[in-house]
Amino acid sequence: MYIKNVHLINFRNYDDMYLELSPNTNIFVGNNAQGKTNILESIYYSSIGKSHRTNKDKDLIKWDKNNTYLRTYVSRERLDKTIDINIFKNGKKAITVNKIKIKKISELMGNLNVVMFSPEDLRIIKDSPGNRRKFLDIELCKINNVYYHDLVQYNKILSERNTALKNWNNKINDIIDIYDEQLSKYGAFIIKERNKYLDKLNIIGKNIHKKITNDLEDINFRYLTNIKDFDNAEKELLIVLKKNRKKDLERNSTSIGPHRDDFEVSINNIDTRIFGSQGQQRTAVLTLKFASLEIIKNIIGEYPVLLLDDVLSELDSNRQKFVLNSIDKIQTIITCTGIEEIDKYLDKKQSQLYLVNNGKIKRV
């Protein structure tokens, strides 16, 4: 798949911008705060219905306007997709795909698949487990509508259970029993799907990581959960929830479940989060992203669009070379402040250059 064109009205610093894209490599060059990342953000939003930079949709609207409009035309092997999104300052939004109204975000996902790599993605390795859970959830939601549904249901029931814990009495105890059964059902599915995804990452990611590091490093991903028997995860999770209820009542929160899980990234059997160098951590994220590309390709039969937001300057020459030599079959949209460092690795015949200045884009 690839994006043919993008039309933005009142989006961030763009008044009215229409952009034709190459199906190959697109490079947006400009100083900071000129609008390069805004282009990627609009594409990312058209893919999953949320921004990678803010939780507030109103932040996407040009400061003096009441709404913003995004149109993304996507070329697919079977059926092209036109995604139209209107976002209003009052919190409402309207989304259509090929003029059919989208009622749930799950109906939007899968029409345009993207994988984004930005400097902030280093948090997946370095920071709290929540960043790693978010990575897994986003990648799984792209390819599995059932996962999206069960994740939404799990979080809804989890919130209700936590509220019940804060207002506990003997009657509420029976309600918590019902919540525990529901959490076990949805939670077990989430745990098993996350573990399966990490199994796929291990198979694909190991080969990618060896290519990047010239066979010097071996990477491994391991899911960290209190559940020991994945085949009986629902039963085991229910037992542990009941066992931990007293502790949960004291803390007014649910202490166990997929919302507390994590995954470990190790290089040569060493925990990358704690002991890895910054270079190793960046390479681990690079492996995650390129493995995710391959997983999506294996499932839907097409590569997603790759978005690289000012990350090439963060990589050494070997990593830059790997990235630019690996995208010949993938529509890639790159933002950077200059192309001097990567110019020697670019396929000029397959690359389109754009200059970005204060919300204006010039094709070179």
Curated annotation (Swiss-Prot):
A biological process from GO: double-strand break repair
A cellular component term, taken from the record's GO annotations: cytoplasm
PROSITE patterns (alphabetical): RECF_1, RECF_2
Major site of localization recorded for this protein: cytoplasm
Residues the record lists as binding ATP: G30, N31, N32, A33, Q34, G35, K36, T37
GO molecular function: ATP binding; single-stranded DNA binding
Keywords for this protein: ATP-binding, Cytoplasm, DNA damage, DNA repair, DNA replication, DNA-binding, Nucleotide-binding, SOS response
Keyword Cell division: no
Protein's cellular compartments: Cytoplasm
Database matches in PANTHER family: DNA REPLICATION AND REPAIR PROTEIN RECF (PTHR32182:SF0)
Family: Belongs to the RecF family.
Function: The RecF protein is involved in DNA metabolism; it is required for DNA replication and normal SOS inducibility. RecF binds preferentially to single-stranded, linear DNA. It also seems to bind ATP.
NCBIfam families associated with the record: recf
Name of the protein: DNA replication and repair protein RecF
Native species: Clostridium botulinum (strain ATCC 19397 / Type A)
Native organism taxonomy: Bacteria, Bacillati, Bacillota, Clostridia, Eubacteriales
